[in-house]
Regions:
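Conserved adenosyl
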Residues: 1-208, 242-243, 254
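Residues in well-ordered beta-strands of folded domains
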Residues: 2, 216, 259
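General N-terminal targeting signals
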Residues: 61, 211-213, 259
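Short alpha-helical interface elements
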Residues: 69, 219, 259-260
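C-terminal alpha-helical "lid/dimerization" subdomain adjacent to the S-adenosyl-L-methionine
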Residues: 191, 195-238, 243
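Core SAM-dependent methyltransferase catalytic element
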Residues: 243-261
């Protein structure tokens, strides 16, 4: 990193393709690096699965799921309960399906071809539908009530919730804003919720796990962990607003509930 910052006039990196990681590997970004090798991709998915076991899971909490998601959810045959956007091989969605048998709708796992291939091989719950999707493109699961162009073809009804787990900290603000704008266009006003499972670090006195991960995100992606004010500003620029933030312990990730502003 010293060499990178010396060449970069000690400016914070903002381009995912020009970071200490890409300088040291001569690759086109971290995700392209891991997807070039099936072994790397498998190890990365195993890392995500292990990480999932280490922290509290808001979607495991029966009271949280019942009071904030199931209550008021649509129950017709085409209803989509939750979309896990960039959900990898589906570890979190599988646990949700196993621990909550009464979910009133479909579960949709979205990611790129590589992770979806891993998911197909892992025999997920029959309630989970797999969908190849790049979150830098239009969200295909969208509601009739959103402000999207009326000429768009609505492929499915809107979901009760769209879930991002450790996705946006991989991207600098401009890229995160692009992702969020696509998602905002899919939300059904007054019904759909955006759930962001990420760290919300305090402006001072942050836990060392959070600050260490902040440096890692900078080195790999030119990205960062965010404070509450960072999140409010970013979501506001995307036409979204925070409804509530849950945090169980200082070192853990938080859950941000947001909706259309």
């Amino acid at each position: 990193m010293p060499e990178f910052f010396s060449k970069n006039e000690y400016k914070y990196p903002s381009n995912p393709l020009d970071t200490p990681f890409t300088q040291s590997t001569s690759e086109n970004g971290f995700f392209e690096y891991i997807t070039q090798s099936s072994e790397r991709l498998t190890v990365f998915q195993q890392h995500l699965a292990a990480k999932s076991l280490a922290w509290p899971k808001y979607l495991d909490d029966a009271t949280f799921v019942q009071e904030n998601l199931i209550k008021g959810a649509k129950t017709d045959g085409d209803a989509v309960f939750l979309v896990d956007v960039g959900g990898g091989a589906g570890h979190d969605l599988q646990e949700l399906a196993q621990k909550h048998s009464d979910l009133p709708g479909k579960l949709v796992l979205q990611d790129l071809e590589g992770p979806i291939g891993e998911a197909k091989a892992s025999k997920l719950s029959e309630k989970i539908e797999l969908q190849e999707h790049d979150f830098f493109s239009e969200q295909p699961v969208k509601g009739n009530g959103s402000d999207i162009n009326v000429l768009c073809v609505l492929t499915t009804p809107g979901a009760r919730a769209y879930y991002f787990k450790s996705v946006l900290h991989d991207w600098p603000d401009d890229k995160s804003l692009e992702i969020l704008k696509h998602l905002k266009d899919a939300l059904e006003p007054g019904y759909s919720k955006l759930l962001i499972n990420e760290r919300v670090i305090p402006p001072t006195g942050a836990h060392w796990l959070s600050t260490g991960l902040d440096i890692t995100m900078m080195a790999l992606f030119g990205a960062k962990e965010r404070t509450e004010e960072d999140w409010r500003q970013l979501l506001g620029l995307a036409g979204l607003k925070i409804v509530k933030i849950w945090t169980w312990e200082p070192a853990a990730e938080s859950l941000i509930e947001a909706e259309q502003a």
